């Protein structure tokens, strides 16, 4: 595996996105759900074109910028993991608030907040004050998976937006570190109701996108690095791709390596790499060796349908975590400000 040029990524993505729209399958329960007050038909009467508007807004953007899907998926993960899926990650500091969740080093590289805001603007023209920013984040992440070749997941909607953004301290405590191991990861997702199989599946989100070198270099400073399932040749590759500068330097932050050999396609290559010890992060390597997770890694590598089904189930659980519904939250007119 080697770093991909933006031209190569763009060409691959442009061709693949058209095919993925034809091949994606809808996975998920289509019936009404009372899970956290969400519903699969929430906007049926108030904004029936919501999913169409979100998808059409994203399709052209993904062709122009093939890194967008991974950015939107990460945006959703980081929003949901800090006090639930409430679009707080989109808010600018409120009044005298100095350090918000976006100031956390763990949120380094968060992008495409503006794209969510642009989609929200389009929705306001179609159906004012009906669709929450938190639902837009979930739908955008869902479509990011589908438009790169993954399953088109049916997600319940009806989330409301928060009135404030958590502090940097809260984000620091709730987002996992780049050095997270299997124990930390399984505990994190178990708290969101996921089985081990679903936890391994949701890690498959790493099949698209890149890893910044500041997170890769932290592995080499880890005293337990020698116990990781890491191919020595791949370690050499990482050291060449991410030279020995400080993990906190600007050079480390600006340099990155692809997550797997098909980093613009949502497929099972991540699991092939995990088995072979070719993971950028510690968890990416250890997940293929730990006896609790390896059977599922092997199963997903061999059976894409099983991976897609487990990922879809995990995605719905994560996107339904600690949501605000009814009068618990609001619907912002503009995503980065409270009305």
UniProtKB/Swiss-Prot annotation:
Listed GO MF terms: heme binding; lactoperoxidase activity; metal ion binding
Cited PROSITE patterns: PEROXIDASE_4
GO (cellular component) term, any one: extracellular region
Main location per the UniProt record: secreted
Binding site for Ca(2+) 1: 79, 82, 84, 86, 88
Annotated site location: Transition state stabilizer: 74
Reaction equation(s) it catalyzes: 2 a phenolic donor + H2O2 = 2 a phenolic radical donor + 2 H2O
Origin superkingdom: Eukaryota
Cited function: Removal of H(2)O(2), oxidation of toxic reductants, biosynthesis and degradation of lignin, suberization, auxin catabolism, response to environmental stresses such as wounding, pathogen attack and oxidative stress. These functions might be dependent on each isozyme/isoform in each plant tissue.
Designated name of the protein: Peroxidase 29
Taxonomic lineage: Eukaryota, Viridiplantae, Streptophyta, Embryophyta, Tracheophyta
